[in-house]
Structure formats: C-alpha cells, structure tokens
Amino acid sequence: FRAKEIQWQNLGNGDSILKNGAENIHVALESSSKKSLDQNTQRPSLDNGKTIHFQGGDGSTLILKDSINQGAGALYFNQNAIVRAENNDTTWLGAGIVVNGDKTVHWRVKNPINDRLSKLGTGTLYIDGQGKNLGDISVGDGTVVLDQKSFNGQQQAFNQVGITSGRGTVILANNKQVNPDNIYFGFRGGRLDVNGSSLTFHRIQNADDGAKIVNNHRTY
C-alpha cells in the first residue's frame, strides 16, 4: 500500500478500511464474533486479522482514526513513515511491527496495558508520541529510540522494555522513558544505550549472557 497520507478506520465486526482519497482497501481485523471458536491451539478470532505491507511511498503518514486490534496481522514497513493517532488515547494491537533495511518509522500510537508490542527488522522504530503509555515492548532486532514527549505532566514510552536475541538496541532520549527496573534482557541479550541519561537500577534482569549497557551520548 503506497500513499502520502493514509487514514485507517475501524468499521467494527472485524473489518477496517485504509483510505488515501483515490483508493480504499479493506483490511480484516481481530473478530470478536469468532471468539466462541477459539481453542488453546487455534484462535480464529485473532487469525482473522491480516498483515499490511507499506512500500514505495517514502515519508508517508498513517493516521489511526480509531483504536485498532489487528489480531495476528502485523505491519511491515519497507519505507520511511510516520504512524500517529487522531486521538492521544487511541491504541494499536497486533502481531508486531517490522521495519526493514535502513528505514525509520516514527511511532506515535500507544498500546494498551498488559499488551507487548513486538519490534523486528533491521530498521529503526522511533517512539515519539505524547504522554504516558502503559503498554510494553519487546525488541528483537534493529533499533528502537525511546523519545516519548511529555503531555499533561505525564511521560513514559513503555511500562516495560525487553531486549532479546542479541540483535536489538534500545536508545533512551532521556531518563523519563521507562522505569529502569522494568528493563530486562532476554535470550542472548542485546544493547541498552543510556545515551547520557542518569539512571538508577535496583536490579538488572538478564536471562542470558549478551546483555550490554552502553553510553553513547547522542542528541535527539
């Protein structure tokens, strides 16, 4: 899907529409009507959600008009992009975000409490929304920059940050992005760049070797 500005509207009943003015594309979402069919190993309600690939529209903006639960569907970005919500409380859930190559996606959408956003791909996910986000993130590849802005006196990029696989890097723009005690290193660890910020850890959670905490002072 390629366009300079795309609006994403939740139509309900497991359906949504992407609009760019000249073209409309329907995208299936998580379907509550299929929850009665869910079992331990099969979740038709989540499987109803489809994946979207964005490419060819470098610098485009995706605007969420409503909260989206994409279920088992993911977002793949083969281009630079901005993703934002029309309302600061609008949320996105799905199978994850993949930013490929050397591309950068500015992500300005929250995820709900108890939800864990999964980031893959060698590109950069730049978190620069507003206010306090209650969701979590798991970084398995590429770079994630946490630069959430203050809104109404509240500021937090994620409640919990996990770095896994040894290929992920998380960069902090400042010490307001996440509680240091809620940062953990999973299988094969990864890299946390405190980026000149002063942090106090009461514990460092690591499930494997490969965890690195570095301080490369960048300006954002």
Question: Whereabouts are the PLM-identified features?
Answer:
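Beta-strand-rich extracellular passenger or scaffold domains
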Residues: 1-220
